[in-house]
């Protein structure tokens, strides 16, 4: 996970999770991470590692490129 702030990717993840009707806990369970990790992503404190990135995008029906280019 990167430690650089990622406000735009945080917004994309949060809005996609809400649009999917998932709570942070439900998303964490589907992704196999803690709820704290989801909060970390949604606060923009960091981004998922590559393996979690693709799984997260699959669950939320978003493109990895949207997250990777959001804060550049």
What are these regions (language model features)?
Residues 32, 51-66:
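DNA major-groove recognition helix of helix-turn-helix/homeodomain DNA-binding modules
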Residues 18, 29, 58:
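Alpha-helical residues within the helix-turn-helix
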Residues 1-4, 40, 58, 68-72:
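Short, charged recognition helix plus adjacent turn
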Residues 21-40:
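Short alpha-helical DNA-recognition segment
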Residues 1-19:
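A short, Lys/Arg-rich alpha-helix, primarily the initiator
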Residues 12, 23, 49-52, 63:
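Residues that mark the N-terminal boundary/hinge immediately upstream of a DNA-recognition element
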């Amino acid at each position: 996970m990167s430690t650089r702030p990622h406000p735009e990717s945080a917004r994309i993840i949060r809005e996609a999770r809400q649009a999917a009707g998932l709570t942070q806990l439900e998303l964490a369970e589907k992704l196999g991470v803690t709820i704290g990790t989801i909060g970390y992503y949604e606060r923009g404190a960091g981004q998922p590692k590559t393996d979690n990135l693709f799984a997260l995008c699959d669950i939320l029906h978003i493109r990895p490129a949207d997250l990777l280019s959001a804060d550049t």
